[in-house]
Amino acid sequence: MIVDKVTIYCESGSGGQGCTCDLMLSSRRIIGGGGRGGKGGDVVLRVSPHHSDLVWFRGRKEFIAHAGARGEYNNRKGKEAENFYVNVPVGTIVRDLQENIIVDLNQKNQEFVICKGGHGGEGNYKKFYSLPPAPGEEKEAILDYRIPAQVVFLGLANGGKTSIFNKLTNKNAKVADYPFTTQSPLWADCEYRYRLFCVMDTPPIKESHEATHEHNRFLRHLYRPKILVFVSGNVDTYKTEFKKIKAEIALFDAALLEDKTCFYVLNKSDTFKKTPKDKKLILISCARGKGIETLREKLFNTLNHSQ
């Protein structure tokens, strides 16, 4: 299972202490000569292409930046502390402990200062007093990772979602005849006309009377996709299956169905004795490769039109 939600503690560095010392200009004139302290380090959340979930945070949940250096005599400023960078995957939502969104890190190389370092204390240069530095900031935050897919495949067990996913992405995710082969969301890029879009395969949806809270928890990753693809491999029961899937999503969070484009895919069309006349259906056969390119084109055109 992917790790997609953790709580972390961040603390930026306090400013460096200002220096208090005397500077003798002549035998009769003495002034303050202490320099300002350096700025404390920020704690910065940074989107990294090398992270695909939050598993790294299992072993470390506290991130503390260094304090700025003390000011020096002869009005020399203390060295500023380096910023502390915390790498997160693209698609991470940062929330406070009340679950309010602070920032959505959904762009490559995006950065966000979650705790700002304190400014350095004033030295006593040309005056007879110094001022204390500012302390660093402390914050607990929730990192809520939502897979940045644009298309998601949904279905009950043994509908052929993973086979379609493999065909579109040229991946080799596990496929078997027994149910619940896919245990965790899978995502990869699909190419069309030299452009890429991200598609996601999901575990089979369980009906509420037989599902634990954890099993359908992957539905939280429907937050980002613009297209929901409902998949069935049974020509006799596909309408009922699609209704069940929508009902389970609505039960989990009805907002996940809002502002989405829905596709309805009927797999295993090579086994049908009679072809359904439902115009909403996209008929494909993964076994024979039939309809895959049509589906790829429809997905791309819909995404391209929505931008």
For the regions a language model picked out, list residue spans one by one.
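Conserved GTPase G-domain signal focused on the G5
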Residues: 123, 160-161, 271-275, 285-307
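Glycine-rich phosphate-binding P-loop
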Residues: 151-168, 183
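Conserved P-loop NTPase architecture
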Residues: 1-157, 190-192, 200, 298-304
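Conserved C-terminal guanine-recognition region of P-loop GTPase G domains, centered on the G4
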Residues: 190-196, 214-283, 288, 303
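Switch II (G3) loop of P-loop NTPases
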Residues: 144, 148, 167-182, 194-217, ...
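Conserved nucleotide-binding/hydrolysis micro-motifs of P-loop NTPases
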Residues: 13-14, 51, 93, 119-120, ...
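Anionic-ligand binding region
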Residues: 187
